[in-house]
């Protein structure tokens, strides 16, 4: 089993954790229906970029 030889410094620990932050989902408002949806996804009633794509 691998065992470290030296204790990692606070700096190295911080560098490793620098990419661990969570980000919030970016939301958009549809032009036609005014509905909030995830970016690059259709709305619940089937609109994408102002056009009806489903239903």
Swiss-Prot record:
What is an annotated GO biological process for this record, any one?
A: translation
* Keyword set, alphabetical order: Ribonucleoprotein, Ribosomal protein
Q: Name one GO molecular function term.
A: structural constituent of ribosome
Which InterPro entries has this protein been placed in? Ribosomal_bL32, Ribosomal_bL32_bact, Ribosomal_zn-bd
Residue ranges of the region described as Disordered: 1-27
Q: Which SUPFAM superfamilies match?
A: Zn-binding ribosomal proteins (SSF57829)
A GO cellular component annotation here is: cytosolic large ribosomal subunit
The Swiss-Prot or TrEMBL record describes its family as follows: Belongs to the bacterial ribosomal protein bL32 family.
Protein name per its UniProtKB record: Large ribosomal subunit protein bL32
Q: Which organism is it from?
A: Yersinia pestis
Q: Which gene encodes it?
A: rpmF
């Amino acid at each position: 089993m691998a065992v470290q030889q030296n204790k990692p410094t606070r700096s190295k620990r911080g560098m490793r954790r620098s990419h661990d932050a969570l980000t919030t989902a970016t939301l958009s408002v549809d032009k036609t229906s005014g509905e909030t949806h995830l970016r690059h996804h259709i709305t619940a009633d089937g609109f994408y970029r102002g056009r009806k794509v489903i239903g």
